[in-house]
Curated annotation (Swiss-Prot):
Pfam entry (one): NusB
SUPFAM superfamilies (alphabetical): NusB-like
GO molecular function: RNA binding
Name under which the protein is recorded: Transcription antitermination protein NusB
GO cellular component: cytosol
Function: Involved in transcription antitermination. Required for transcription of ribosomal RNA (rRNA) genes. Binds specifically to the boxA antiterminator sequence of the ribosomal RNA (rrn) operons.
């Protein structure tokens, strides 16, 4: 069975973009974007509903995290595509326990490269998500268990000068 997660992320991004520009609800905006292959795949639909549901339910909280880490940027000044990529990745980081944080961040970067109008968008998305992820990790708000879900690499020891 094929995995459609990237395609689903792209469809959700398109739905969020539509929502910003048109007077419609998010379910309608997302519904007409789904392909027959996604609709026929129960695992794909489960992921779609989980991710979209978490974005809808937690958008205010997600936006607060983004706003807190976009210094000197008002949320209204962030490009619509970039803002919605950040929202989607944040929903994955916070509420999709089976997706490693690095995967969520990498997917956001790749989608930014594909959909954003400037080359700097992927760097912007990467920087913001990295800062938010590090803050969430420090606060103990990333609750992912299982192999590969959290990087347990110990921090490097500070280099000492051997000439003392």
């Amino acid at each position: 069975m094929k995995t459609y997660r990237r395609q689903i992320r792209e469809k959700i991004l398109q739905a969020l973009y539509t929502l910003e520009l048109r007077d419609t609800d998010i379910d309608s905006a997302a519904g007409w974007l789904l392909t027959p292959e996604i609709l026929a795949d129960p695992k794909a639909m489960k992921f779609f509903n989980l991710l979209l549901g978490n974005i809808k339910e937690h958008m205010e909280e997600i936006d607060r995290y983004i706003a807190a880490h976009t210094f000197n940027w008002d949320m209204s000044r962030i490009a619509i595509i970039d803002k919605n990529i950040l929202r989607m990745a944040m929903a994955e980081l916070l509420y999709c326990d089976d997706i490693p944080p690095k995967v969520s961040i990498n997917e956001a970067i790749e989608i930014a490269k594909k959909f954003s109008s400037t080359d700097k968008s992927s760097k912007f998305v990467n920087g913001i998500l990295d800062a938010i992820f590090n803050a969430l990790k420090e606060e103990g708000k990333i609750n992912k268990n299982g192999r590969g879900l959290i990087d347990h690499t110990p921090p490097r020891a500070a280099k000492t000068d051997a000439k003392s």
